[in-house]
């Protein structure tokens, strides 16, 4: 009887230690994400929109939009902490994607459940909170849709990866737009702007150590090369590159355990 009681005490102590360690890890990770969100506040000046800390006065539904986008991003990142095997780095946020969703290469329509026919569900992105659209209804009644987002998410899911095993981000984390065309436009970030985003990219990669990093296109490849990290370059799916992207990402995924 005494031996049994001692064994139970040892087991209970071991469980308590593991639980405490897991709670500490979760707290540290959460602190890391919150610190990362604060870093994102420091966006460069000029024709750059910061969706997590700025209001798009012409196109946001209301002034709560930045806070909603921060919640979206926080939930998305927390879902993937400790389980990511693949990091995919794009160029910059687009006005049809992260500008309103708050998540790179992810459209409002994905979050609102309007891409289920493409095999993409809102819970693939996050499930801890309910998604909320931040754009007003005038421009796109069903929310904005981004072709790159649909192609990237759809391809990775069809290749059999669990959504928490991959995380999407951008070399330039904010939305660079054409000042003559307004917020609802995209442009390539300048070299000076890309340099301003380097710290955020480095912090992001430290948050999500993984087996493979994929660069979508030349801008992402250039930034990753500057950080001296190993990566696989694949064709960006935009501008007619979808077919080649699917072929190349399939090869990368086949090599991933």
Predicted regions, residues:
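Alpha-helix/helix-capping structural signal
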Residues: 218-219
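Short, flexible loop segments at boundaries between secondary-structure elements
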Residues: 229-255
């Amino acid at each position: 009887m005494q031996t049994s009681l001692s064994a139970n005490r040892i087991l209970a102590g071991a469980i308590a230690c593991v639980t405490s360690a897991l709670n500490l890890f979760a707290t540290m990770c959460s602190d890391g994400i919150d610190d990362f969100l604060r870093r994102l506040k420091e966006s460069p000046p000029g024709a750059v929109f910061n969706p997590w800390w700025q209001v798009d006065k012409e196109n946001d539904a209301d002034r709560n939009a930045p806070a909603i986008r921060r919640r979206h991003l926080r939930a998305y990142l927390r879902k993937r902490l400790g389980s990511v095997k693949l990091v995919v780095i794009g160029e910059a946020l687009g006005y049809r994607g992260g500008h309103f969703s708050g998540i790179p290469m992810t459209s409002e329509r994905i979050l609102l459940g309007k891409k289920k026919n493409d095999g993409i569900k809102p819970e693939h992105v996050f499930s801890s909170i309910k998604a909320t659209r931040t754009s007003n209804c005038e421009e796109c009644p069903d929310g904005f849709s981004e072709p790159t987002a649909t192609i990237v998410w759809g391809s990775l899911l069809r290749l059999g990866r669990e959504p928490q095993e991959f995380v999407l981000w951008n070399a330039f984390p904010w939305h660079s737009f054409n000042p003559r065309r307004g917020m609802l436009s995209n442009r390539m970030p300048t070299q000076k702007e890309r340099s301003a985003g380097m710290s955020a990219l480095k912090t992001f990669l430290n948050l999500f150590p993984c087996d493979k990093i994929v660069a979508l296109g030349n801008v992402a490849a250039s930034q990753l090369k500057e950080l001296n990290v190993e990566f696989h370059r694949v064709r960006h799916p935009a501008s007619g590159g979808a077919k080649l992207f699917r072929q190349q990402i399939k090869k990368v995924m086949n090599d991933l355990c």
